[in-house]
Amino acid sequence: MIGNRLLRKMALALLLGGAALLPHGAHAQGAKAAAESLFQAAKQLMADKKFAAACPKLAESQRLDPSPGTQLNLARCYEGLGKTASAWAEYKGAAVLAHQLGQKDREDGARDLARELEPKLSKLTIVAAATPGLVVKSDGIEIGAASFGTALSVDPGEHVIEASAPGYEPWRVTVTIGPNADAKTASVPVL
């Protein structure tokens, strides 16, 4: 009986250990296939001008199998949604990835598209006085003190700015940023 149990455990260990060696190649192929399926579905959605449905599929395709082509399409999709800062960032990312892969034409094209968007980028500047323990967030993402006073590229729309510090009342404001090079400043009051 003990021998059978030991044999079963050894067989299970070999099976699991061997399985751990397989997923790299098998998983990579599965990820590539899933990425391609998502990409094709997104391309059709974009052709139908359904950008809100297409962009998440492209983002997931890019996560599963990063490529400059997918990233360029994601940027175009964000442009279709009016998310100029997101599109600009994806174009710049696609240029970097294309450069790393030696795809000069794609690199140049992505850089040109990013450059074309730059004059249209809307900006948000957050100004805050030094308060011990101050934490400032924009749309839930912490903004470091080095960013204070710098015009940051943001997508048009509403942005929630929050500030808090130990021993102080938290502060919150919603700033609406328009398209086409709108610029707004959110001034965090002394808490």
Question: For each of these PLM feature ranges, what is it?
Answer:
Residues M1-L191:
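Acidic, Pro/Ser/Gly/Ala-rich intrinsically disordered segments
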